[in-house]
Amino acid sequence: EYVAYVNAKASLGYDTVDEMKADARNYLESSKESSKKSAIRSAVMDKLGEVCTVKELPDGLLDARMEEVMAQYESYYCSDGSSLKDYVENTADQDYDEFVSNVTDEVTSDLKTQMILEAIAEKEGIEFDQDGFDSYVGNLMSNYSYSDESTLYKSYGLSADSGKEYLKKVYVCNMALQKVVDSATVEDEAGTE
C-alpha cells in the first residue's frame, strides 16, 4: 500500500529527502491513527453486542434482507448466467446449504447490530440529515469508484430505491456508533487512557 502511495507521490516529485521522509512519517502516523480508530470502533461494536440484547427480529426482516443479499451475490458472481449454487459449489470449500447458513448467520448478526444502533440513534435523538448523507454517498462513490449514485444504490439493494433506503439506515447507524465511540472511555492494553 505504501509503495503505491509513494509511486503516486513520486509523480508529483519531492525536492528533498527530508520532504520525502516527512511525507512518509505523516503517512505512517495517519495510517496508525486510522488503525486505532478502526480498532476502537470494533471494540465498541463488540461491547455493544455483549451488553445489548435483541430478542427477535421483526417478522419478514431477515427474509427481505436475505433476498437482497443473495441477489447481490448472484449479480456479482453469476453474470455469466450460472446459478449461485453452481458458483458456490465449484469455487468455495462448502456446499450451497452451508453457504446459505453462513450468510444467514452473518445477516442475522448484522440486522441485530443495526437494530441496536437504531435504538441508540432514537434514544439519542440522532436523525437523518440529507447534507450529511450526500457527503457519505459522495465518499462511498469516491472510495469505491462508482460512476453514479444509482449504480452505488443498486449494489446495496434489489433496486436503486431499496439500496438508497438501506444506505440511509447505515448512515444513521454510523452516526449512532460514532456517538457511542466519542463517549467511550478507551484504555490501551497497558490500562492507560
Language-model segments: residues:
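Conserved interaction-surface patches within small, structured recognition/assembly domains
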Residues: 101-106
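Peptidyl-prolyl cis-trans isomerase
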Residues: 1-97, 108-193
